[in-house]
Structure formats: C-alpha cells, structure tokens
Amino acid sequence: MASTSGALVDDNVLEVLRKAQLDAFISQFVFLFNVRRFDHFSHVRDKDMLEIGMQQVQIRQLREQILKMSREMWNRSDPKQVYIQADQSMPAQNSIDEKALIPNEQIKLYELIGEGSFAVVKRGTWTQSNGTHVNVAVKILRDISPNIMDDLRVEASHLLKLQHPSLIRLYGIVRQPAMMVFELCEGGSLLDRLRDDKKAILLVSRLHDYCMQIAKALQFLESKHCVHRDVAARNILLARDERTVKICDFGLMRALKENEQMYTMAPQKKVPFAWCPPEALRHRKFSHASDVWSYGVTIWEVFTFGEEPWVGCRAIDVLKNIDAGERLEKPKYCSERIYQIMKNCWKFNPAERCKFGAIREDLVAAMFLDAVARETYNSIQPGALQLTKGDEVVVVENTGQDWFGQNKKNQKFGTFPRSVVFAQTNNAVAAATAVTPQKVPTAPTIRIPPSHPPPAPLKPLNNNTKTSLNDRTSKISMPVAGSFIHTGHGDPLGGQSWGNPATIADMYLKNPVNGAPLSSMSSGAEIIASKELLTNGGRSTHQPAAPSPAVMSKIRGLSLDLPEYDDFDRAFDDGFSPSKIELPREFCGNDSVISGGSNSIGLANTYVMEPPKQAFDIRGNRVLPPTNKAPVLIPTNPAPSVISSTASAGITLSTNSSQMFTSQDRHSNMPANLFPELQHRLNQGSSTGNGVRPRPASSIGIQNNDLSMLNPQVNRPFSVVNVPIVQQPANIPCLVPTPAPPAPAHFSQPVSSQRVAQQQQNTLQKALNDELKGNLNKRPTGTTAPPSNGFNAPRADVAPVQQRPISSASIPALQPQPIQHIQKPIQPQQVRIPPSTAPVQKPVQVSAPTHSNVAPTTSSQASADARNPLPPKTSPPVSNTPITVAPVHAAPTTSAPSTSVVTRRPTSTTAQMSDEERRSRIAMDISSALPAPSALLYGSNSTSSLPSAAVSTASSVPSTARDNPVETRPSQPHVTMPPKKSSEPILSSEVLQPTRLPSATTSQAKPVTQPIRHPSPPVATVIPTAVVDKKPVSQNQGSNVPLFNITNSSNGYPQLNGYPNYGNGFQAYGYGMNYHQGYPGYQGYNSYGNGMGQLALTHNAVTSLPPLVPSENRFSGTAQPLGESDIMEFLGTQQRQAGSSSRAVPPASASTSAASGITDLSMADKMEVLYREADFTHKGNCDTMVSQCNGNTEQALKLLKQQHLVDMELAMSTETARQALEARQYDLPAAANMLLG
C-alpha cells in the first residue's frame, strides 16, 4: 500500500518560520528535525541548523521569534494543524532501510503473550534469509490508517537507530499487515513477575538494580530527545535469567499521540492517568519531565511488588489529590532515601523535577547494605526476622538500634537488632548510607622529654585467650577518628623505609583511643563506651587504685584515659548529672583555673609538688587538700532565718570569707555519699515550716548553697579561685524575695544575735534543725500558726525595732527593700485582675497602706483566728453610688477574721503616698486579688463553685485608717478569699458542686450577674421568658438574631463568608470546619465542589443576612438558646424579607406563574435552588448568569456548568463542554471524568 508523503504541523510552527524568513527551510524542520509542534523547537540545536545551511544571523532571528511567540502563547487559542507535503527533491531522511523491511512470509505467529492499548503481542519465529530461526515478539497494530502508517515509518526509523542494552531491540517492520518485530524477552513483564505468588520473592537488592537499569535507559532516551510517554512496570520486560530488564513501547506512544484525536475521549483503560503528571492530564503535554514523573510511579510499583497506584480513584480524583499536595504513600519494603527519590520525581512544577542523571546518582547513594548474622536470633516479637548464624541479610533501613532487612535464604522481611549482624562495610556504598558522625574533639599533643622515662604501662584490654571468636568479633568497631598513628613507613624501592612493628612504644599499643567510629553508630558495630565494658559485660566496675609516690613524682601530663562516662546515653541511664563532672586540678603552686581540660602553662615550665598524702573521692578521682584556703565569693543573697522589718531588709555582703570555714573541719570525715541528700534537704527545706525557696547555684562565684565547705578535700569543679571579693553596697536597690521561716513561740532571741548564731551554726546541724522544726510545726498544737498562702499583704505598720514572734501568717512572701540610689520614684504598675463570675460587691481599688501604731496580735491569737474563722456573709445589694474603701492591715481584736476584709465607707481626701507605700500597695493589690493556692488547686470548703465574698463591718477598721481615709476608684475588684481551716488536709476530699447556668426557658426570671470585662459598674440583667421586639430596627433590618447564632456561624465574619442555614447558623463559603450533628451550621470545605467564596455579596445576599445588633446576653458568659417562637419569628421575617427583595423586578413570565398558583416557586426560591446546585462557583456568577438568561435559572445552571469545565481546563471550548454535559445528562463530575478519559 502506498503511503502518503506529508505530515500535520501546527500553524504556529509555520508562523515562526515565516516571520524568521525561513520559508526555504520548512521541509527540513518538519521532516528532518521532526518539528511538528511549537515545543519541538527546544530540541533543535544550533549545530544541526548549521549543517543544513543556515547562517548565524538566521539562527539568531529564529531564536528571537521563538522567544516572542512563547510570550504570546498564553493569550492564543489552540493551534490548528496544517498538512505539509514533503519535498520530493529532499532525500528521504526518515525512510526505512530495505534491510529493516521484513517480508510477511518470514514471520510465523504463535500464541498471544500480551495485549496493549494500541496493539496485541504474539510470540513468533522469524526465519531469516540465511535460514536462521530467531524467536521474536510481534506487535500487531490495531489501527492501520494512513496517518498511523506514516508515523509508524518515522518512528521505526528512529527505533532502528536506538541501540541500548536496556532497550528492547527492533528487528524490523512488516508493511502488510502493519506489524513490528521485536526481540523476545522470555522473562515476561516485570509487573507479572512482581505479582506472581508461585515464584520466590525478589530481593530488594535486585529491585534496586532494576531501577538502576531503567533510569539508565531513560537517560539514554533523554539524550536522544525521545520521550517515552508510557513508563510503567507493565512496559518493562525481563530476560530469561531475570537479571536484565528492557523497556518496550518507547517511541510508539509518542508516534501515536502526535495526533491529538488519539488522546482525547479515549476509554479509561487506555489512558494511564495514574502514571501521568498533572500537566499531561490537563494540557496533553509530554516531555522528559513527564517521563520522570512516570518513572517515580514505576519504582513505587516495583517496591510495592506490583500494587496499583491510586487504586479505586478516577482520573479527576487523582488530579484533585495531586493538586492538594497528596502523593503515594511510602512502600513498606523500601528505604527512606529511595522514597525521597520518588518524591523528587513527583514535584508539581516540571522544572523542579530531577534529571535522570541525578536520579542515578541518588540510587547509587541509596544502595542497600549486605550483612552477615554473627549469631542466631530467634524472637517471638511480631515482625521480627529470624536469623541463623551465617545468614546473609539485605539491610533496608539501618537507623536506630533495630534494623529492617530481608533474609536472602528465605526472602522474608523483618526487624532485628543491629548487634546480631556484621555489616560488610567494605562495600563502596557503606559510607554513603551511614549518618555523618559528630565531630570528636581531638586530644592535645603530648610531648614527653626524652630524659624522663615513659609512663607506667597499663593493663591490656583483654588477655582472656579462651574467648570465642563470636565474642571477639562482636567487640570490633570501625576505626576511631585520630586513632591512626604513623609509627613506621615502608618503601617498595628501598632506602626510605623506617620503623619496625616490634619496636612500637607501649604507649601507642596499650592505650586505646575511644570515640565515635567513622561509620557512626547507625551503620557500624556497637561503640564501646569505656575499656572496662569489654570484660565486664557492659557495666563498668572501675575501681582505681592509689598510685605510688614514684609515679606521682613524674611529670604530669594529660591522660589518654577518657572519663568513665564518655557515652551520654549510658551516663544518663545511670543517673549521671553534669554537676558531678570532676575536672582535673593542676599540681602547681598557684591555683590556676582549668577550662575544658587544657592548661595554659607549658609542660616545660611545670613544677612538680610532692603531695603530703593521698585521698580519693567516691568516684575514684584523685583529690588533694588545699594548701591555703582559697578566698571565695559569699552568696549575694543569704537567707536569714529571722527578718525584723521592711525598713531593715537590706542585704549586706560579708568581706571576710574566713568566717564561713569556722566549723567545717570537724565534719570533713563525713561520708561523701550523704552530700546529695543534704544538698536536696537544704534546697527543699521544710515544705510546711520555713518555706525557704532554693536559690540558683549555677552562676560562677556562688557556692552551691554553702555545701562546698562541708568537705574541703572534695574538688569542686565549678568554683572559681583567686578571685577577689566583689565589693557591693550595703543595701541592694531591688525587690528581693525573702523567706518566711516559722519560729517557735518561746524563741525570742534578738535579731542581731540570731543572725550571728545562724552564721556560726554548722550547716548540717542547721539543716537537721530546720527539718525537725518543720516536723514539729506540722502537729496541730495550740501555738500553730495558719500556713501562709504566699499572697498576704506586707506588714508595713510594724516598727522596725520591734521584736515579736514570727509566724508565717504575718511574714509577707514578697517584701520590698529600701532603695537608696534611685532618685526617680517607681511608678505604680497596673495589675489586670481576672474577671469573676460570683455575686460580689462592687469592684473597688485597695488604697496604699498607711503607717499606724497598732499592737500586733500574738501567734496564739492568730492561730485561734485561723481555727475559728467567721463565716462569710452575703453581699448587700449593689447600688450605683460611688463607694470608697480603706484596707485593713491588722486585726486589733480576735473577733476579726485572719483573712483580708474590705469595708465600704465614704472618704473625701486623697493621701500622698511615698515610694515605699506605693510598693507596699502594689504588693497588697496582688496578694488580695489572687486567691489562695489551696483554693485554686484543691478546692475550698464551700460546696459552691464560686468563692464567697466576706462582708466587712465598720468595727474592723483601725482608728488610724479612719483618720486617714484614702479615696479609691470602684473600677478594679477586690476579691476576698474564703476562710481556711487550720486542720484542713492537703488534698481535700470534698466534691465541688457545679453551678447551674441560667436558661431562657425557665418560667420565672432569674438575675444573672455579668462578668466584669471592662472597668464599669456591674449590672444585673433579668432575662425574660418571652422575646419582646424592642430593639431598634435599622434601614435594611428585617429581623434580629442573637449574637450567639451569628458568632457560631463560621470562622470569619458572617457578612462576608456565610449565608443563612434556616436558623441553624450560617454555612461557610470559605475554609470552615466539618459538619457535625451537634454543631449545626458548619459545613466542610470542598476544594473542587465549592468555590473559594466571594468577598462582596450581592444586594440580595446582603439583605438576607441579619444585622449585628448587641443583645441582652452579651456579657452573660453563657449562650441563651432561642425559643420556638423566636425561631419561627426569625424564619418568617427572613423569608418575607428575602422574598420582597428578590421579587422587586421579576420577569413577566415569572410574575405570572407566581401569581397563578401557590405551588409554583418564587424567584427567591429558584435562586436558592440555583445557589445550592451551583455551589462550585460564586453567587455573583450565578446572579450574572441569571441576568443574562432573563431569569431562566435552569439555563443559567447549564451555562455555569459549561463555563466551569472550561475554567478548569477540562474542556477546550464551551461547545466541547456542552457535548460532554449532554452526554452525561448534565452530571458535572461524570462529564469531567469523561473529558479526562
């Protein structure tokens, strides 16, 4: 059959060539360079154009026209194809050699071995002219149209030139019938082999090799400017030995798809949408980047052993998932690095996808390790891999303690400990799969003068010759950084060799260098934390012996032995703390500071000192008693046990450090293991008695709570020596938190003598006494003071020189200190008080404390008040008159409760406060506003969930406070704490009773107290049972909706992104939450079913929304449900309003039909139906389309669906969209699926 000599070319290709004045070269570009589309210009090189006779000026003009056309492509319609007749004078470049034409009688066909989308494949035999029989695979094309035959001839000419080991070989073609003769791969399809259950499972290492061969073949096609277009596991063939794979169908898909009609409207089974990138599904563009995407899906098939990608999804579903950022999940039997290669192939932007050359490099780096089991591993854990000694394992994942791999003997997968295998790190890819180890600090160079003998040899690591081979090999690890020492050199030519293995110094042979191996812990063997772990089964039993004086007299250098804990994880498990690190101390005459284990003084200038005696601490480190007591810094914030007053609370610094060591020598023989316990007790103190807060001791120059003086021989690593004492002023200008320790009633020693006694007291004895006193204070005696909640107001009315018993109820937790060096007064800070929902009295502001000479109460009186508190009284009715209050600082009689009481009384003047009074006022505001910790954490004694407000009387106000009243503003609340019983347990067993919330459906009105959100007088609101329409009606207001329904409508403003949902809130246009039955009004967002929402609604939509009007329950704190009458009134008003607004100017037909019968839908109802049906677009588009259709909503819906398919680029024109919709009865998803194939 004679074939036509011509081709179909896009018109924009001819336009570019004509604008560049290259009409004479059109035949060469079309038939020689195969430029049929505009994007084919990118494959034409300048070298090729020079070979056909083009000049540099012509090439430059062509490039300019191509660039100009590329900028205009977005505004152009689809190109039209023009038939170009081939030039008969031009040599047939694409003509097939006569040797490639096979006569039909030489082919003998047998059984069917495969069936593809465009052809069937049968096994056959080709009898050559010399009589040789060759087994071949014959592909018989289904379509034999003239255009197909022309494309077949062109593609066959290219396939005959593509010779690669991983590409199927084309022997020739048969003209009649149209057949292509390929080499036969007896292994069959790779997809069938992966799914075959009767054969053994392929090793993952073999699968990795398949991926390497496929990538290499596709890289070869990329270099030849060939696009495969159908890379999949079904198009990969196996050889008989199953070691070689070959790609088939390359070039054929491109030849068939050059004709656009062959791609569109094809059956679903013929379109590999699961392997196609999004640009190929939308724009029918295939390139090398599309082959990269398909290659990623292919290796996903390989490592899932033949699973179907995107199973159960349609073409439109796959496109939606890809646009949403979803990708295929990680296969179970591939490593993380291979899955990363897949994700690199699945980049949404084609320009960001990697090339096949980079893919091959990544695959080499992700090659699997081979390991050998050094012992038998049998585990009953699910998913564990059973191993026998000597089994070979392919390691898939080698991160962590448990590895994942495949046993080569039984092809099973599972996890196993990395310690039971030995990884063959001699593989070239071992370093690539290992994690980069952390940098290990190198030890300083040791220079030993030759005049001195070498150090004493250490004991070898392990001299046990009876250890088995398995035990010895399990201790072998990769080389450690810095462990190779050049002790000899060999020269094959002679003359340059030096050194002998027999004369290597014992210092190098018997002193191991520990550290992280070069291959890191993830791929190497187990790291030995210390040398003792080699012989003690993983647990160190290091007990250093006392060195001899002869060894101590030698020159001291840095030891090669690392500390006992050089593995942080093991040290952390053993309870090791960084504060226990013992840094080495120099044996120099001066106490130099050692930082990081390095010494700034050279070894040549080091002076050796003979120690008087040897001493060792609990860890076995060598310590020496100091020759001279080094001066240290005294803590700048000592905790005095007795505080006299606020006037004399300045902290003084001691300038004589020798007083701290007056009584330490007598306790130097105390066991060192008691230090942590004493440290803990001193830091914590008595939890119920003194309440001393631990101070941070991490700063340099501050002792760790004065514990370092208990044992002067213990080397404290973080103490600084030879540092002069810092001179500080006598008074610290700051607010210092001071402790409030309890004192017994009989303890009345003066303050000055008590401080001296405390400073001279033994630290251990002080700790035991404090604990004893704390235990005594826990007993409910007659002199027990109520525990302080830490928030009481400071006692500013006590004279500084007055001596009285100290109790926790009278000592403030935050005591202001006198400031002498600050000239500018401190401004009072504004304290935000949390809102309260309890019915309390009108909020007031507590005035500043004033000085008064009130006789203090004794501890027995205070305890009696605490045991017998007055019950709180009900708050009187609140009036709108301004109320002032004066605070109460002390109770002169036992009738007043121990808690703070607020009294309302008129005042007329405002007192001028000093700086100290202002600070005291701030402290008292904080203490009075915050409730007791026990009431917050454990619950109060009351059965109500709200704190009761105590009512104060005029008799509880001191006379001094009455004489000097202070005006306050009633804008900030003063919450009084409920009284506490002294014998109340720590954890209260009483159950808190919930507070009943007010409801609008009750038969009678109930007063509801509003929470205080702004500094305004509280208002008691009465909620009526019936809704009374007394709210002002605006111009566009048809009905009022409570704020509860509007605020629960969506996540944004209801006017912009919501529409009514029949009284149940507002449905969201934008991103909203999923619909739930318990939360009506919420509807999930569908990225393809719904639009993104409109920012400006139409007039009809705006008028249908209820306005935002403040309701009565704005500050109620609880949502009031609507009654049945409210809902009916709201719905009726809204429908009337929507109907009146939408029926303003109806069409004549619509108005007639509406008036004729009640059953006909009104225009508003039709619009609502249209809005629901056309939820894929905006309401504004619906209104515009209805206007264009003269009110015909059905026609508007059809046009909207057609326009939506065009906007989604699923249809090339509205006519195509209309045909697809009519074929699917205007079912939009079905029509979109049909357009996608």
Curated annotation (Swiss-Prot):
Alphabetically ordered keywords of this record: ATP-binding, Cytoplasm, Kinase, Nucleotide-binding, RNA-mediated gene silencing, SH3 domain, Transferase, Tyrosine-protein kinase
Disruption phenotype: Defective in transport of silencing RNAs but not defective in execution of RNAi. Marginal enhancement of cell-autonomous RNAi. Mildly defective in silencing the intestine-expressed gene, act-5.
SMART domains for the chain: SH3, TyrKc
One annotated GO molecular function: ATP binding
Protein kinase domain residues: 107-369
The keyword NAD is annotated on this UniProt entry: no
Biased composition (Polar residues): 749-766, 778-791, 847-863
SUPFAM superfamilies, sorted: Protein kinase-like (PK-like), SH3-domain
Biased composition (Low complexity): 881-910, 940-961, 1138-1156
Superkingdom of origin: Eukaryota
GO BP terms: regulatory ncRNA-mediated post-transcriptional gene silencing
InterPro entries: ACK/TNK-like_SAM (IPR055175), Cdc42-bd-like (IPR015116), Cdc42-bd-like_dom_sf (IPR037085), Kinase-like_dom_sf (IPR011009), Non-receptor_tyrosine_kinases (IPR050198), Prot_kinase_dom (IPR000719), Protein_kinase_ATP_BS (IPR017441), Ser-Thr/Tyr_kinase_cat_dom (IPR001245)
Major localization class: cytoplasm
EC number: 2.7.10.2
GO CC annotations, alphabetized: cytoplasm; plasma membrane
Domain writeup: The kinase domain is required for import of dsRNA into cells.
Protein family per UniProt: Belongs to the protein kinase superfamily. Tyr protein kinase family. SYK/ZAP-70 subfamily.
Function of the molecule: Tyrosine-protein kinase which plays a role in RNA-mediated gene silencing by mediating import of double-stranded RNA (dsRNA) into cells. Not required for import of ingested dsRNA into intestinal cells but involved in subsequent export from intestinal cells to internal tissues.
Identification of the protein by name: Tyrosine-protein kinase sid-3
Organism for this UniProt entry: Caenorhabditis elegans
Lineage: Eukaryota, Metazoa, Ecdysozoa, Nematoda, Chromadorea
